[in-house]
Amino acid sequence: KIATGEFSKIISRLGGQDNAFTSHDATAYFQRISKDRLRQVMEMEADRMLNLKLAEKEVLTERDVILEERRSRIENNPGSVLDEQMSAALYQNHPYGIPVIGWMHEIAKLSREDALSFYKRYYAPNNAILVVSGDVTPAEVKTLADQIFGSLKPSDAIKSRVRPKEPEHRAARRLELRDARAGKPTLYRYNLAPR
């Protein structure tokens, strides 16, 4: 229903704000809207979960934004480069060793098909959590959620979550990064939490 690039514009026209963030474990989409717009925004999220539209031009534009973000936040910051390399050394068999933003060479190759494949694999009601706060009661939210999301079919592609474990480290892992841009020497020390 909602055309590429229109979601945020609609939220803005409704007097709201929206944004998103990604972590190692989740991607979150959130909106700040008035209570009288809650149903409409929940319907928009249900539509996005089932009918995402991705135009090639939009994907390429967003890919370039991510590349620039990586350059400015990681590549141009020695501390961030070291942090990223430390995580990669610490988590050699776990997804936490992969930067949330991704590696530069992988981002550069991102295509519309890659994005749609990821969407089809992970975006489903049985892989989502709805959180609502504000001037609403749990009963009101549950009624809306049942009406709007209740008929969405779960995805068979979503399997039981695999919780990979990093094998016990038997030797120290040390990294040294020398960078003329670093203002002062810095020591980072990472450890895996005990099981």
Feature-to-residue mapping (PLM):
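Acidic/histidine-enriched alpha-helical segments
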Residues: K53-R71, T137, D156-A171
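Solvent-exposed, non-transmembrane alpha-helical starts
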Residues: R39-M42, N76, T143
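Non-catalytic, conformational "gating/processing" segments within enzyme and secreted inhibitor domains
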Residues: R63, E113-I148
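Non-catalytic beta-strand/loop surface segments
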Residues: I2-R37, R73-N127, S151-R195
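Conserved short hydrophobic interaction patches
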Residues: R48-N51, L144-L152
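Residues within well-ordered alpha-helical secondary structure of globular protein domains
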Residues: R13, M44-D47, V65, R121, ...
